[in-house]
């Protein structure tokens, strides 16, 4: 809205030309979302406590996390509000990619909201069925990717990290591939959200990393120089990434150990889903394995645990899955686990950025 109000005035007031720049607006989208989440945080927590939206702790981690029972959850509503309001204020709202990104973010958030509401209403840790959750994710992701593929400037070619001119065209297979990326990322963040600050830290790192990739993909000069696919207009989504980073930092203000507020599925599913969609937008889908390495490790640990438990007749690889609970049961302090996972996330984001020159 600010963009559409001030840019037309730049012909009369030259200083307003600065609002044309994506980088400038991304920075202020970050700051706006940060202020919104920090200022509204206390009110949100009081409201959630008033309507009894407290966290229920599963039996397996009851002894470790019993002090967390009753902590306000569904804090993803606060984060989502900050992201969407900031994006609406600072982005070019004539850009289809911005609207698709917000659609994915809100859609996955709605699936998470229904799941959280079901848990709270039933006073248990089980929400909607896995099939219902997957169906909701497929509906949102399928709609967004379907609309994306219809855009003339978008291609179904796949960029492969470390290879300069190897871009296989997946054709109709691109749709299920993109759905796998988005839903996998969504569930990966959801599985990681088990300790104070654990999921939001790598989410901030991943959003920052993809802000670079999405900006480069939308800039024809940079895209050609770095040999990455150019998607005209997609650079505007950098503003959304800035808002996501800012809201994430504001949410971390209250989610840091000991957490005063949990994001719930409304936060984790929306963040993961939109990170996957941004990876699809800028044609860096495979790099999400590196950028979101923490989420990948957590997901793999669950798959390994469940698979081995079934084939071995009840034996386990880890003391508990996801992986962060394994370290908890080994006696590693929660704050140390979180900080170490953050460090790993930062290193993997830097590794992903380095692929821009390793080709």
Curated annotation (Swiss-Prot):
Its EC number is 2.7.8.13. GO terms for molecular function: metal ion binding; phospho-N-acetylmuramoyl-pentapeptide-transferase activity; UDP-N-acetylmuramoyl-L-alanyl-D-glutamyl-meso-2,6-diaminopimelyl-D-alanyl-D-alanine:undecaprenyl-phosphate transferase activity. Pathway: Cell wall biogenesis; peptidoglycan biosynthesis. It is found in: Cell inner membrane. It catalyses: UDP-N-acetyl-alpha-D-muramoyl-L-alanyl-gamma-D-glutamyl-meso-2,6-diaminopimeloyl-D-alanyl-D-alanine + di-trans,octa-cis-undecaprenyl phosphate = di-trans,octa-cis-undecaprenyl diphospho-N-acetyl-alpha-D-muramoyl-L-alanyl-D-glutamyl-meso-2,6-diaminopimeloyl-D-alanyl-D-alanine + UMP. Keywords: Cell cycle, Cell division, Cell inner membrane, Cell membrane, Cell shape, Cell wall biogenesis/degradation, Magnesium, Membrane, Metal-binding, Peptidoglycan synthesis, Transferase, Transmembrane, Transmembrane helix. Its main location: membrane. One of its GO terms (cellular component) is plasma membrane. GO terms for biological process: cell division; cell wall organization; peptidoglycan biosynthetic process; regulation of cell shape. Coiled coil: none annotated. It is a multi-pass membrane protein. The chain crosses the membrane at residues 27-47, 73-93, 94-114, 134-154, 166-186, 197-217, 233-253, 261-281, 286-306, 336-356. It holds the Pfam family MraY_sig1. Its cofactor is Mg(2+). PANTHER family: PHOSPHO-N-ACETYLMURAMOYL-PENTAPEPTIDE-TRANSFERASE (PTHR22926), PHOSPHO-N-ACETYLMURAMOYL-PENTAPEPTIDE-TRANSFERASE HOMOLOG (PTHR22926:SF5). Belongs to the glycosyltransferase 4 family. MraY subfamily. Catalyzes the initial step of the lipid cycle reactions in the biosynthesis of the cell wall peptidoglycan: transfers peptidoglycan precursor phospho-MurNAc-pentapeptide from UDP-MurNAc-pentapeptide onto the lipid carrier undecaprenyl phosphate, yielding undecaprenyl-pyrophosphoryl-MurNAc-pentapeptide, known as lipid I. This is Phospho-N-acetylmuramoyl-pentapeptide-transferase. It comes from Maridesulfovibrio salexigens (strain ATCC 14822 / DSM 2638 / NCIMB 8403 / VKM B-1763).
């Amino acid at each position: 809205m600010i963009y559409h109000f001030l840019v037309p005035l730049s012909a009369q007031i030259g200083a307003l030309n600065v609002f044309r720049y994506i980088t400038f607006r991304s920075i202020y989208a970050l700051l706006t979302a940060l202020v919104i989440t920090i200022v509204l945080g206390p009110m949100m927590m009081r409201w959630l406590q008033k309507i009894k939206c407290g966290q229920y702790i599963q039996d397996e981690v009851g002894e470790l996390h019993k002090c967390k029972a009753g902590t306000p959850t569904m804090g993803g509503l606060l984060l989502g509000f900050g992201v969407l309001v900031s994006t609406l204020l600072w982005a070019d709202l004539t850009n289809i990619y911005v609207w698709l990104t917000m659609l994915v973010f809100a859609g996955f958030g709605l699936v998470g909201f229904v799941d959280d509401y079901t848990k709270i209403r039933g006073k248990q840790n089980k929400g909607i069925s896995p099939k219902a959750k997957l169906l909701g994710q497929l509906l949102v992701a399928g709609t967004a990717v379907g609309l994306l593929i219809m855009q003339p400037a978008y291609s179904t070619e796949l960029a492969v990290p470390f290879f300069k001119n190897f871009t296989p065209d997946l054709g109709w297979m691109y749709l299920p591939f993109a759905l796998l990326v988005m839903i996998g990322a969504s569930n990966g963040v959801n599985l990681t959200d088990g300790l104070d600050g654990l999921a939001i830290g790598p989410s901030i790192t991943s959003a920052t990393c993809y802000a670079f990739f999405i900006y480069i993909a939308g800039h024809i000069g940079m895209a050609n120089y770095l040999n990455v696919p150019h998607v005209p207009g997609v650079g505007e989504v950098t503003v959304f990434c800035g808002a996501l980073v800012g809201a994430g930092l504001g949410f971390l203000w209250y989610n840091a150990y000991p957490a005063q507020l949990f994001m719930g599925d409304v936060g984790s599913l929306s963040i993961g889903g939109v990170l996957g969609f941004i990876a699809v937008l800028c044609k860096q889908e495979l790099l999400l394995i590196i950028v979101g390495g923490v989420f990948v490790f957590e997901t793999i640990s669950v798959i390994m645990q469940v698979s081995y438990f079934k084939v071995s007749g009840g034996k386990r690889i880890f003391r508990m899955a996801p992986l962060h609970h394994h370290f908890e049961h080994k006696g590693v302090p929660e704050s140390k686990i979180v900080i170490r996972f953050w460090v790993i996330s930062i290193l993997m984001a830097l590794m992903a950025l380095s692929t821009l020159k390793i080709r």
